[in-house]
A protein has these predicted regions:
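N-terminal domain-start signal
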Residues: 1-334
Length: 334
């Protein structure tokens, strides 16, 4: 059975009056920089209590991963029930479909059970995705995901290279993400999708140069949907020219400059600038009173919060100095 694409219904900004007001009222509960700093200077138990104040379950009792995953699942479901337009939350769920796809394909190749590593945050139930992959029948699973999994499996069986399978699924993810964002019809969301693709391609270009890869390799890993043509990025690599001029008219210019300067050593600053550029984009929704931008920004803030919470608590449990953890943190939605 093939997947039928749903036409996303059109909505006016005023359709978002209720959910915008609701999410604005919940924003103070989000993890802020002030709360994160307090967690860094506290014990693991005290940090867990701070997370409870942000709406998370009891971390010491159920474990960090379950607490974070349960929080994401609850917020996704709540916003899906309240949002007037289909597609917005689905875009945020999509990354977990492809995470599960990578896990299932690679687990099959090495003969292990993928279940413990599967996420429940995707559009499709993880078990349904696994069944579709095993039977070749999409059922309720998006056909684009199943097709990409089959392509990745074929490539993996020929090459025995897990990275190649990941690259195929990454490209499929960005292609479907761009298509779905276009269907939703939100200029704000399409801008975010384009910025994500540009960020992914800049990271790929910087890493390719550090690894002394050629333009053919880089072309194979660049994803669709960005504003910078793949040919221009590959040409800069081939001619050993800096990438920053290509990104001069984008929000990623500072990150690109940092990438050009990071031929050796740590990429921490470069990676943080890339992520912070994405945070700065959705933070623009702060000036919007109501509309789908408010929903999109809240979901982005949630994902950032979960990443920060995981980084802080894991760092504290590992006994890392606060400054070391802080250097890895990204900007939070303020």
């Amino acid at each position: 059975m093939t997947e039928q694409k749903k036409k996303v219904k059109a909505c006016k900004d005023t359709d978002y009056l209720f959910i915008s007001a609701y999410l604005r009222a919940k924003e103070p509960q989000l993890l802020t920089e002030e709360k994160a700093v307090r967690m860094l200077s506290s014990s693991v138990q005290e940090a867990a209590r701070t997370l409870e104040g942000c709406g998370y379950a009891d971390v010491p009792t159920i474990g960090l991963d379950k607490a974070l995953n349960d929080r994401r699942a609850a917020v996704f479901s709540e916003i899906e029930a309240l949002a007037p337009k289909d597609g917005v939350v689905a875009l945020f769920r999509m990354r977990y479909d492809y995470h599960n796809a990578k896990t299932i394909v690679k687990a099959e190749a090495i003969g292990t059970d993928p279940t413990p590593l599967l996420s429940g945050a995707g559009r499709s139930e993880a078990q349904a995705l696994k069944t579709a992959y095993e039977t070749g029948e999409a059922g309720s699973v998006p056909q684009a995901v199943l097709t990409a999994m089959q392509t990745a499996r074929d490539a993996l069986s020929r090459s025995a290279d897990p990275q190649l399978a990941d690259l195929i699924l990454d490209r499929a993810y960005f292609a479907e993400y761009h298509e779905t964002a276009t269907q939703v019809g939100s200029a704000f969301l399409m801008g975010y999708a384009q910025l994500q693709a540009d960020s992914a391609n800049l990271r790929a270009a910087v890493r390719a140069r550090r690894m002394h890869k050629d333009a053919a390799f880089l072309k194979s890993v660049l994803v669709p949907g960005g504003s910078i043509p793949a040919e221009e990025i590959c040409q800069s690599l081939a001619q050993d020219e800096p990438f920053a001029p290509l990104f001069a008219n984008t929000a990623l210019f500072a990150a690109a400059q940092a990438g050009d300067e990071s031929q050796t050593g740590s990429l921490t600053t470069f990676e943080r600038l890339c992520d912070n550029t994405l945070t700065a984009y959705f933070a623009k929704a702060k000036s919007v009173v109501f509309g789908e931008q408010v929903v999109i920004a809240y979901l982005c803030a949630l994902e950032n919060e979960i990443s920060a919470a995981r980084m802080i608590v894991n760092g504290l449990q590992a006994g890392l100095p606060a400054d070391t953890i802080r250097a890895r943190l990204r900007d939070l939605y303020q």
